[in-house]
Amino acid sequence: MGASPSWLKDMVCTPWPERDANHLLVTGSQLEDLEKTLFASGLPVEALMEKAGLAISRRLLKVLNKPDWQQLAADGIVVLVGPGHNGGDGLVVARELHLAGLAVQLWRPYPTRRPLTEAHWRHALWLGLPELPDPPDPSQPQLWVDAIFGIGQRRPPGEKVEQLLIERQRLRPGALVAIDCPTGLCADTGRRLGKGAATAAITFCLGLLKQGLIQDSALAHVGRLERIDLGLPLLPLTGLADCALGLGGRDAQSFAAWGGPSGSHWQGPPDPAASKYERGRLLVVAGSCRFRGAAHLALAGASASGCGSLQASIPVELANDLWTVLPHVVVRQGLGATETEGLDLAALELDGVERLDAVLLGPGIGLPNPKNTFSPASDASAWEQLGAFEGLLVLDADGLNRLAGQDHQQSDGALAWLRRRSGPTWLTPHQGEFARLFPHLAELPALEASLAAAQSCGATVLLKGAHSIIAAPDGRRWQLLEACPAVARAGLGDVLAGYAAGVGARARAHGGLDAQLLAAAALVHALAGCRVSHRPGPAGTEPLAVARNLAHWPAIPSPTNPARRSEGS
């Protein structure tokens, strides 16, 4: 990778959210190192296991007291005991459930390897908990507690256990909970280690969230993820410098109170004396004959951001009537577009683009022809001007696909163009668009791939998914912890792209653009989707409903830099 762009050194790095147990997303090795630090300090291994088991048993007893779970509790509990410390945690849980009056049985598929786990096993048998001589019947109604393997899983659990777990889910879905990590699932990547893995209704994650458990590939196996707080001291957590940070609902509120970058402060309401041009100037290049609605959705998202001046370069057929639905949007240019050729970027006029704070390119613009082949010369002028633009460039959808198809006269094409760009860039791909732009990274786990992409091209990357990931070139990463599958509908990404671009335009107008703003925008967008999903009927989750809901959220604060004043148009 070449020298960093000049603007990159000015990016702020104040941590948001706090790097604490509520937000850190760790790998198994990081947690093992943390445990070694705690044990070296004098904390007995026995104390941590007891603490974990007691915390899970208290939480599980509360769950089993709920109406939907009471019958499972009445039918009894089967604890699947592994050979290591995860099995020991399960035995503490089994003991406490037994002492609470529940009928608990034990089954261990492998010989016990850890002395502490063996001690808990002997004690459980002494208390009278029965050991099953054969694997439990997967069709029976008892609740299964999966304590076979936790974060240390490196290989498949074996055909016998895998088939048992598969049959359990087929015959009794929703009747298994997992301790720390479902057996057969990698806690680092979220991928299955073999042919099958436990499918949990709830996964009780001990101490810190394991990064693999919130990846898209893991969601069907993890079920509802609950972090069990173990009261870990803050000091050793500060040493986990390379962790991604999880973002939840409370973090949208805490963003407004965040101290912000040095030399500036974060404000909610805009400066009362600021003109519309000092509240962010954004150009949206979107839409085509085939995807006409994308322009409307992107502009609706941008409008919800609170940016002061919104311009559009869209198909001429849309431009003529835009005033009837979005009267505040200034039509900068009506562009030619056909069903098969997409939006004509060769005719895009960017004179005076230096006066803008941000440009969004891509939602619904289509491809140059239906076979997804590209004519490098057709868009060359637009890419040249956008490369020289010193403001924020947000690339989404077919903007990314067209970039990936350009020659750019470099051996690594699009990536070299991104590195040469004069201003900051935000990329918002879904997995397919990411694979086209970064084919060499497409098979990596999402957290690893997004960071490698950001560092290779110098852009901030928002990799969209059920739990979207935001990665900055300086190494910071965030991942959304909350999402609603009901709002995964066509057009939602257009709203997000417009909203994020508007937030970025406001920030740049105030002189304090940062990758954390893209993370905050993605979080608020996801929460708006969750909010509208509670409305009755499918219409409540339409993308325009999300955009309307975004408009009612408090504006994402923008950093104020008194030294910068933006000129008018």
Task: State where each predicted segment sits.
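N-terminal small/polar loop signature for handling phosphorylated ligands or for N-terminal nucleophile
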Residues: V92-L171, N320, T324-G336, L345-D351, ...
